[in-house]
Amino acid sequence: MTSPVDASSSKEKLTLAEKVWRDHVVSKGENGEPDLLYIDLQLLHEVTSPQAFDGLRMAGRKLRRPDLHLATEDHNVPTEGIKTGSLLEINDQISRLQVSTLRDNCKEFGVRLHPMGDVRQGIVHTVGPQLGATQPGMTIVCGDSHTSTHGAFGAMAFGIGTSEVEHVMATQTLPLKPFKTMAIEVTGELQPGVSSKDLILAIIAKIGTGGGQGYVLEYRGEAIRKLSMDARMTICNMSIEAGARAGMIAPDETTFEYVKGREMAPTGADWDEAVAYWKTLPTDEGAEFDKVVEIDGSSLTPFVTWGTNPGQGLPLSESVPDPEDFTNDNDKAAAEKALQYMDLTPGTPLREIKIDTVFLGSCTNARIEDLEIAAEILKGRKIADDIRMMVVPSSTWVKQEAEKLGLDKIFIEAGAEWRTAGCSMCLGMNPDQLKPGERSASTSNRNFEGRQGPGGRTHLVSPAVAAATAVRGKLSSPADL
């Protein structure tokens, strides 16, 4: 954690993002040049790190701060047949090479790694928080788009490219220009049966997939304050789907309670000092954002996507839209293209869309709370005969906690597959893929063409909608059961 700047000496009103930025500036850029920002934590995985390590090696450089790097194996790992974590359990040669290379690099450069078979292994954006490595007020980067997940703790977290990964390895800094700030004010309270996934899908549908471009989004309001940390991570995770650089939620007692006692969290007097600093981070009253967007949380209902980007979504109670109803020519063309790929007819009730595969997994929605929500709906029920349901915990720790609660038995008895931890069907980079033409209801974060496998069609949903859909065989909410 970077030592805080004494804000009491300044009357300037700052947002959460501006405070974290201020406390990490090593040198201020002049004449339009970027600031040099200190990075508190870099997360690594097997896909975007090899070239960065090679860059260090070719330049004869050391890894400046191995202690501020944390690695895990997640993107390419299989989610079945894993017993020991041996490389021989990975059948795909390219995936095996990437995992092997990560292990070799971490050993050579002294980076802490949690490999397959380790109880602390899992998707990188679950591993950081569960270890207590993710803390309020930090700057966190990773060669992965959904690094914004960690913003749920009041950290400024964002994805970077491989050349930037190497830069952080070599210097523990990044040259960056300050981001703009946007407040997402969620008024009212979420109704029973409405989740943080429904909320973030509704936000993206409102502002668009480019609406947050260049901004850090700060999610605010009583509805946000009442969310658990698992739910907050879901919201911040998908900030990138609105085009934002990062998403943040101010730390509070819910945050502190989550972090306290975890392996890498401060202890004793250091904990007290850290909490005192964290309490200074929330946006000052009277601070100005570059943009403010309001959304009525009390009016939301279960939300799903119908198209091929996360902004193409509607309440589950509605029907597939008609491209002719779009007033913007670009939106109209995008809708026409999406409906052709998704093989959907305008006017079809969303609840009548038949599903082949239900995927409960990813860094968006596969933490313990997500699994509990789905298991409660599936308890005593069976999934539809022609449905395949895959349940993939986001970490080995989450898997073990779920098994202690008996959730695995509920899923298996319902007819679902209970897998080991990994990114799995979120992306077509491992054995878990849709076949061409197959349609999924997925708790992941992206519904792009081919994202879950060539020709696969993806509808983004919440864990509750995923579970209800598995039972009914069509897009459904628990109220439909």
Swiss-Prot record:
Q: What does this protein do?
A: Catalyzes the isomerization between 2-isopropylmalate and 3-isopropylmalate, via the formation of 2-isopropylmaleate.
Cofactor dependence is on: [4Fe-4S] cluster
Q: What is this protein called?
A: 3-isopropylmalate dehydratase large subunit
Where is the stretch described as Disordered? 432-463
Tell me one GO biological process term: L-leucine biosynthetic process
Annotated gene: leuC
Q: What is the lineage of its organism?
A: Bacteria, Bacillati, Actinomycetota, Actinomycetes, Mycobacteriales
State the reactions this protein catalyses. (2R,3S)-3-isopropylmalate = (2S)-2-isopropylmalate
Query: Which PANTHER family has this protein been placed in?
Result: 3-ISOPROPYLMALATE DEHYDRATASE (PTHR43822:SF9), HOMOACONITASE, MITOCHONDRIAL-RELATED (PTHR43822)
Pathway info: Amino-acid biosynthesis; L-leucine biosynthesis; L-leucine from 3-methyl-2-oxobutanoate: step 2/4
GO molecular function annotations of the record: 3-isopropylmalate dehydratase activity; 4 iron, 4 sulfur cluster binding; metal ion binding
Cofactor note as given: Binds 1 [4Fe-4S] cluster per subunit.
Q: Which CDD domains match?
A: IPMI
A family per Pfam: Aconitase
Keyword Lyase assigned: yes
Which InterPro entries does the annotation name? 3-IsopropMal_deHydase_lsu (IPR004430), Acnase/IPM_dHydase_lsu_aba_1/3 (IPR015931), Acoase/IPM_deHydtase_lsu_aba (IPR001030), Aconitase_4Fe-4S_BS (IPR018136), Aconitase_4Fe-4S_dom (IPR036008), IPM_dehydratase_rel_enz (IPR050067), IPMI_cat (IPR033941)
State the family it belongs to: Belongs to the aconitase/IPM isomerase family. LeuC type 1 subfamily.
- Species annotation: Corynebacterium efficiens (strain DSM 44549 / YS-314 / AJ 12310 / JCM 11189 / NBRC 100395)
Keywords of this entry: 4Fe-4S, Amino-acid biosynthesis, Branched-chain amino acid biosynthesis, Iron, Iron-sulfur, Leucine biosynthesis, Lyase, Metal-binding
Annotated SUPFAM superfamilies: Aconitase iron-sulfur domain (SSF53732)
PROSITE patterns named in the record: ACONITASE_1, ACONITASE_2
Oligomeric state and interaction partners are given as: Heterodimer of LeuC and LeuD.
Class in the EC hierarchy, top level = lyase
Amino acids binding [4Fe-4S] cluster: C363, C423, C426
Q: In the Enzyme Commission scheme, what number(s) does this protein have?
A: 4.2.1.33
